[in-house]
């Protein structure tokens, strides 16, 4: 019984460290450019804020990144990097589409 309690305590305390995935987490990007170093702490005034799926401590799956100057990225992430989605400026104009981790289609037009 004592061993079972020790094992359960270990799993509960260290499960975020040993690489499981979570939906709806918040991370903050540290660094000046993509790809960021992702941390669970930050200030939305100085660090880009990510909300979405997280695996192994980095964005992986669907999520939203909001930069400190107002642009936003909505879409999928792969191993902490932007993968397939759309980047908008602070006014809601589409500025880039991302396809398999590369910026594409820099047509500027208003989204509705």
Write out the residue ranges for each language-model feature.
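Sec-dependent N-terminal signal peptides
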Residues: 4-13
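Glycine/tyrosine- and acidic-biased, solvent-exposed loop/turn segments at the edges of beta-strands
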Residues: 14-112
């Amino acid at each position: 019984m004592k061993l079972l309690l020790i094992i359960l305590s270990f799993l509960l305390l260290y499960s975020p460290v040993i690489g499981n995935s979570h939906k709806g987490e918040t991370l903050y990007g540290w660094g000046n450019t993509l790809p960021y170093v992702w941390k669970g702490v930050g200030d939305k005034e100085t660090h880009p804020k990510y909300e979405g799926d997280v695996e192994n401590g980095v964005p992986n799956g669907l999520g939203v990144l909001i930069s400190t100057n107002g642009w936003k990225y909505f879409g999928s992430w792969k191993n902490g990097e932007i993968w397939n989605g759309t980047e908008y400026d602070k006014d809601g104009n589409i500025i880039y589409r991302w396809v398999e981790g590369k910026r594409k289609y820099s047509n500027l037009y208003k989204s509705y």
